[in-house]
Amino acid sequence: MKNHILNHLPYKSSFRFVDNISRLTEDEVIGDFTLKEDAFFYEDHFAGNPITPGVIITEIMAQIGLVVMGIFLILKDTELNFDEDNDLFPLLTSTDVSFFKMVLPGQKVTVVSKKQYFRFGKLKCYVEMLDSTGEVVAKGMFSGIIKQVDGLKK
């Protein structure tokens, strides 16, 4: 099921921030991503001393912590068989994130997300990002919806 979920992520390789999903239940998802040292956003942020932009940290947290879980819950709760012409499109509706540590190029991060609620198509999760030592890099609340979009091209 985890690989099936990853196949539904609507991102191409340069903006897909999910390497692995190690746990996936109705209430929790745990996944990781290793930031590539040659990622496009490091060249200018900050030149000569690159760090991962907060918007990228937020995006990693959203992709693993909200989108993966949302797709899982929708596929689990419906009898819909999504294919290339009937894809799922995630829409982030709100975030409230606090940052505690820098994330450097080449660093592996783990995202842990716990569902707060999923009703009427809206998912809300408490999401934490941890570094390789288990220290919290960022944490916050994420909300979003996932819609079916016919003919969405990847």
Each model region followed by its residue ranges:
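Short aromatic-glycine motifs in intrinsically disordered, low-complexity regions
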Residues: 1-12, 84
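Beta-strand-rich interaction surfaces with strong enrichment in secreted/lumenal proteins
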Residues: 6, 48, 98-101
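Catalytic strand-loop segment that frames the active site of acyl-thioester-processing enzymes
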Residues: 10-57
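Hydrophobic/aromatic beta-strand elements that line small-molecule binding cavities or substrate pockets
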Residues: 19, 96-97, 127
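Active-site- and interface-proximal helix/loop "cap" or "latch" segments in soluble metabolic
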Residues: 52, 57-69
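Hydrophobic beta-strand-centered segment that forms part of the acyl-chain substrate-binding groove
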Residues: 66-112
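HotDog/MaoC-like acyl-thioester-processing domains
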Residues: 102-154
